[in-house]
Structures are given as structure tokens and as C-alpha cells.
Amino acid sequence: MSHLAVIPARGGSTRLKHKNITPLLGKPLIRWITNAVLESSCFDKVIISTDDDQIFDAVADLNVERHIRPEHHATVTATVLDAMMDLMDEVETYNTFSYFLPTCPFISPDDILKGMEKLEQRQCDTVISMTQIPETVQLACLMSEDNVLPVFDNLEWGITNSKFIKKYYKPSGAFYMGLWNFLKENKNFFAGKTKGVIIPPTRSVDINTIADIKYAESIIW
């Protein structure tokens, strides 16, 4: 099977200026995920999709190619999914398509290999990196001025012991993988059979602020 990886990184980040090239322990943020993708040795081609020359310059010495991200896909309101689906129309066809976000620097080559193995064995249509939600979701309630309404039935049944409460997960944001033809047809990573690769909380850091950078550096050390 042939595999394409894309790392989308627009230049116009708002909360943290130049986020994708902000140093994390002296290394531009985008290099962390780029190195992991390359070290996995899974992909026939790795593309950096960016509208910013500085972002590509930060990884230009690595075995990557550049896709110039169109202006309409580089705005604050643009979605990564739309940008990736359009990019698939512009490049040659592969068997699988994956994209990785530079804001999640602690993904390992082994995480990527686990996801790709699921696709190659045709266990599913798509694979998404997942992490456990630390809060006990089943204790959630909706509140109004007049009432407190449990979201889940367990509170009505008096079940609050964590031993009897299910674990909930969410996308970690690090990567999305899928079979090429499936994505071309559905343009959605959740439309078919989806499997997850669980990323532990200590490696599920999503960097959007300086505080996130400092937290990430504290974890490394």
C-alpha cells in the first residue's frame, strides 16, 4: 500500500503568534511532529501544507515537500478538514491519507505505526488518535435557574462510584488517518468504521498558548 502524510500549518495563528514555529526546548514546534512522521518510515511522501515561508523553512532540511496552502484555507474560520479534502484533489492518488497537527508534539513513531497497521490490515476505514477525558463525564449536569438536570441516567440511578462509570475518550488532535477512496467519497473521518490509537494524557498536550509550551517543557523534564 502507498501512504501520504500531510502536516497542515497555517501562519496566521491568533492566540500564540507564530505558534507552529515557536521553540519547544529550542526546537521549532513543527519539527517535533515532522520528525515523528519521518521516523515512523510509514509514508511514501510527507507534505507540509502552509501559507508561511518561515514555517516551511523550519523543516526544509528534512525529507518533506511543500504544498502552498491557498489563502481561503489559511483564514481563522477555515477548517483543517476542508483544506485536507481539497489537497487530496490536487495530488496524486495513494492508498491512504493521513494528516498530523504540529500542535501535538509528543506523538511517537510507534503511535503512528499502530494506526497504520490498523489501516493496512483493513480493520477499519479510518484511525484517529484518542485520549481519555480526565473528568468523570457521567457526572455532568445541565443547569438552569430553576433546575439541575443530569445528562446521563447514572445520576438518576444513584450511581456515582467511578468503578461503575464508563471511560470516555476524545480525539487528541494529533492525527487522522484513512483509506483514500473512503475519504474521497465521504469527506469525513467518522462516516464509517473508525478505530482509535490511545495516547496517554502526558503525551496528549495540545499547544495553543505560552502556558501550554511551559507545561509541555515541564513534562519533558
Question: Each PLM stretch: what is its role?
Answer:
Residues 2-49:
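N-terminal glycine-rich phosphate-binding loop and ensuing alpha1 helix
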Residues 42, 61-63, 144:
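Short, structured coil segments at secondary-structure junctions
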Residues 82, 105-193, 198-199:
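Conserved core of the sugar-phosphate nucleotidyltransferase
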